[in-house]
Regions:
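Phosphate- and other anionic-substrate recognition elements at nucleic-acid/protein interfaces
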Residues: 1-74
């Protein structure tokens, strides 16, 4: 399972994450807390992490960027 893009839907209490491989196929679908997103990012090799631009997204983006990921806010 090689995840190249991780889509993150930020919520107040939980976040939904979807991981896509290089062909665009869904290989991971999970609901986690915001801290869980950071822990998941630490386990994954460097990839693109896409999330909506909302309050808290910039902080989470900085944390994920420090882990070596490419963060894209939409």
């Amino acid at each position: 399972m090689t995840i190249t893009v991780l889509g993150i839907d930020l919520g107040k209490n939980s976040c939904s994450v979807v991981g896509l491989d290089e062909t665009g196929r869904v290989v991971l679908r999970r609901r986690v807390t915001r801290d869980g997103v950071v822990r998941l990012g630490a386990k994954l090799p460097a990839c693109v992490m896409a999330m909506e631009a909302c309050c808290g997204a910039h902080h989470l983006g900085r944390v994920l960027r420090e882990q070596g990921h490419e963060v894209r806010l939409m």
